[in-house]
Amino acid sequence: MSASAAVATRHDWSLAEVRALFEQPFNDLLFQAQTVHRAYFDPNRVQVSTLLSIKTGACPEDCKYCPQSGHYNTGLDKEKLMEVQKVLEAAAEAKAIGSTRFCMGAAWKHPSAKDMPYVLEMVKGVKRLGLETCMTLGRLTQEQTQALADAGLDYYNHNLDTSPEFYGNIITTRTYGERLQTLAYVREAGMKICSGGILGMGESVDDRAGLLIQLANLPEHPESVPINMLVKVKGTPLAEEKDVDPFDFIRTLAVARIMMPKSHVRLSAGREQMNEQMQALAFMAGANSIFYGEKLLTTKNPQAEKDMQLFARLGIKPEEREEHADEVHQAAIEQALVEQRDSQLFYNAASA
């Protein structure tokens, strides 16, 4: 394959073509993915995000993989929406350890009218800290989507999870079409899309191909494509599911990189179960984004210091954003926190 063909951006992938990618010899697939990756990205830079659960547990959805679903007894404590100030403090800490994007996740089917003002203030406050912002709040109306865009939200995460054909085996409380509609609203509002899926739920290779086809054949590719490895949690229906073969996981990352050459492909949930060699292969396959910090919503994530040690051994550096001088930026953080503390738009989680 010529270099120009290898980096072509397409939106017309067929199942037969994607199957052929998955069926390549492993070394050939990784070579192709790395070639595509180098055409668009510095191969030794990885974008670093931090994810905070701003509202945990008691979700009305029945996603079989999720410990936050109210349908399953996983021992997870239910928590109400975090106070805006506490979210901003967590964002400032994320900034201090090197994150460039702060992602906020709420266990909702959709945000309520009473919660939206607090969510919008979180976006505005995190933006003032100099971080990119991302949220995952469930299904959105067109009006809610526009309000988030007006507040300055950069990314909205709404995963497709799996192929349309396998989807009904995992979720029954939200349709695939509703997920696609939310993504369309996000794009229409001018925000960037973060959307991917989960491996290890009992899906076939064709289902993995089908997920990537749905994402790559959108009118515009998602700017961020998180590929999660199922974190099996006791109490969920998928707790005893068979482990994903590490090479199959790496293959999926590589195919995602080839199909969506300009997207950040995120090595997302499941890193706690991956050894350093598997993570290194993931970066070779074209993954160039990770979540950074102690927890990924409600499951363990490798500690930040451990991540930086691995980066140093591999010669990888965090992707940077254009920043102010340190003292100017620190002053901006402190001022934003003071302004938010004095704001009347403050969610008292204890009294709700």
Curated annotation (Swiss-Prot):
Concerning Pfam families, the annotation shows: BATS, Radical_SAM
Gene3D superfamilies named in the record: Aldolase class I
The cofactor binding remark recorded in the entry reads: Binds 1 [4Fe-4S] cluster. The cluster is coordinated with 3 cysteines and an exchangeable S-adenosyl-L-methionine. Binds 1 [2Fe-2S] cluster. The cluster is coordinated with 3 cysteines and 1 arginine.
Catalytic activity of the protein: (4R,5S)-dethiobiotin + (sulfur carrier)-SH + 2 reduced [2Fe-2S]-[ferredoxin] + 2 S-adenosyl-L-methionine = (sulfur carrier)-H + biotin + 2 5'-deoxyadenosine + 2 L-methionine + 2 oxidized [2Fe-2S]-[ferredoxin]
GO MF term (any one): 4 iron, 4 sulfur cluster binding
GO biological process terms on file: biotin biosynthetic process
CDD domains in UniProt: Radical_SAM (cd01335)
Domain spans labelled Radical SAM core: 44-262
**Residues given in the record as [2Fe-2S] cluster binding sites:** 103, 134, 194, 266
Q: Give, as in the UniProt entry, the pathway in which the protein acts.
A: Cofactor biosynthesis; biotin biosynthesis; biotin from 7,8-diaminononanoate: step 2/2
- Has UniProt tagged this entry with the keyword DNA repair? no
Which EC number applies?
2.8.1.6
Q: How does it assemble?
A: Homodimer.
Q: What does this protein do?
A: Catalyzes the conversion of dethiobiotin (DTB) to biotin by the insertion of a sulfur atom into dethiobiotin via a radical-based mechanism.
Q: What is this protein called?
A: Biotin synthase
Q: From which source organism is this entry?
A: Pseudomonas paraeruginosa (strain DSM 24068 / PA7)
Its lineage reads: Bacteria, Pseudomonadati, Pseudomonadota, Gammaproteobacteria, Pseudomonadales
Gene name, please? bioB
